[in-house]
Amino acid sequence: ALPIYPDRNYTSLKKTIGEYCHISPEHIVVGNGSTELISLLISQRQAKKALVVGPTYSEYERELALTGGTITEYNLKEDLNFQLDLEDFFASMAEDVDLLILCNPNNPTSSAIKNRDMKHILTFCNEHNIFVMIDETYVEFAPDIAEITAISLTDEFDNVMVIRGVSKFYAAPGLRFGYGITSNHEFLEALLIHQNPWNLNSVAAYAGERMFKDNTYQQTTRQLICSERDRMYMAIQNMPAFKAYKPYANFILVRILKESLTSFDIFEAAIKERMMIRDCSSFKSLDGEYIRFCIMNPEDNTHLLKLLEQF
């Protein structure tokens, strides 16, 4: 109700999230968007040396820069289709890294680290006193969520926090609602102490509960995205001018193979057709000409495919 303050502990909301994620409500912290939780985690860890797996979302490095620590990058390799090579990853990790940041599925590559590999990463990091932040903003779009999500690993490992939001899958960025999951009670308490009270308004808390119980929306959205994503991925694979990478999020990364054709050329052509795609030239560590586009409704997707076929 709007005339009264929200429950300061968000008890009912955490219970609903716990049921949705199959996790104890005691392991959950809610935030004013996943961005608040990312900022809070980074500021509280005070990492001396953070490792970010890229190319990825630029906000991580911006927040890390505010803490004054050193930032290093491990870049996914195009010749491996942006899939993480665990052996090379572990071998290249500096001994003094104390915070690892992953986006899974990753933005902008749409690649993903499977749960079994994530367990190896968490084991390695646990042995080397490295805390791991996993941004799962796009995980609900994955063909098999259980195959990707690390939430099931938070009971086993206390050196990890998984962060999610409702901006993408639930198409509700205006709510500013995110949540984090960790079994590290000491760290969780530190986060709660440094959070502003009532950081989530009553409307967002109520909407969050309704969203996580809406099985019809969840199933319909997943069916649409999965079927259309497969259709677009296969279609682009047959276009000689492009190379598409196996997608796990609600978008596809495409490399332009045709000489003299640039990402801006395609961006401009799409704008003329009243479509918006991402020119990826601004992403660090993404060498070459790339575009990225989101999966839309079938009609818009077909419209984009017809445009790409012209090249």
Question: What spans do the regions from the language model cover?
Answer:
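PLP-dependent aminotransferase class I/II
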Residues: 9, 159-238, 242-245
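Conserved PLP-binding catalytic core of the aspartate aminotransferase-like
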Residues: 226, 239-273
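N-terminal small-domain helix-loop-helix segment of the aminotransferase-like
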Residues: 1-36, 40
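PLP-dependent aminotransferase-like
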Residues: 11, 43-102
